Structure formats: C-alpha cells, structure tokens
Amino acid sequence: MARMVMCKKLGKELPGLTFKPFPNELGQRIYDSVSQDAWKLWLEHFKMIMNEYRLSPADPRSQEILYQQAEQFFFSEGAQLPPDYRPPRSKG
C-alpha cells in the first residue's frame, strides 16, 4: 500500500513519494508533504527551468537555483517563470 501524504501543492491526501528527492532539509520536506502527482508537475516545471536558464545539474549554483524554485513551487504561491519564457505552441 502506498504511503499517503496531505499534499501541500494539491491540497488533498494522495500517494507520497517513494524517495527523498534532494539530500537536504528541502528534500525531507518534499518527501513528507508532496504527492507523486505534484512531483510529476514539478518535473515538467524543472525541465522548463533547466532549458530557459541553461542550468547544469552538476553546477552548485544551478543546484541552488533549482532548490529555490522547488521551494517556491511546492511551498509558496508558485514559482515564477523565467522573464523571457515563451510557452511552446500547440500543434494544430
């Protein structure tokens, strides 16, 4: 049976993560209070941030930006989009 959490992002009880996503206090907070569904939303936001800011996961400064963005995404009103971000055009 899946571990259930009261998801901070989605505001309801849902299956929690099966792993601690970051090796720090923020990773523990996410593990304790973020659902798998909210994590999937984060992964899409994460890809956009990585591409728009041209970040490298191996760079300590890039990691700090990602931690700040994750903090805002999950525990604040939401993360801000990069200033020059243009959403992808839908095909059709």
Swiss-Prot record:
Keywords: Iron. One of its GO terms (cellular component) is cytosol. Signal peptide: none annotated. GO terms for biological process: cellular response to oxidative stress. Pfam families: Iron_traffic. GO terms for molecular function: iron ion binding. Could be a mediator in iron transactions between iron acquisition and iron-requiring processes, such as synthesis and/or repair of Fe-S clusters in biosynthetic enzymes. HAMAP family: Fe_traffic_YggX. Belongs to the Fe(2+)-trafficking protein family. PANTHER family: FE(2+)-TRAFFICKING PROTEIN-RELATED. This is Probable Fe(2+)-trafficking protein. It comes from Anaeromyxobacter sp. (strain Fw109-5).
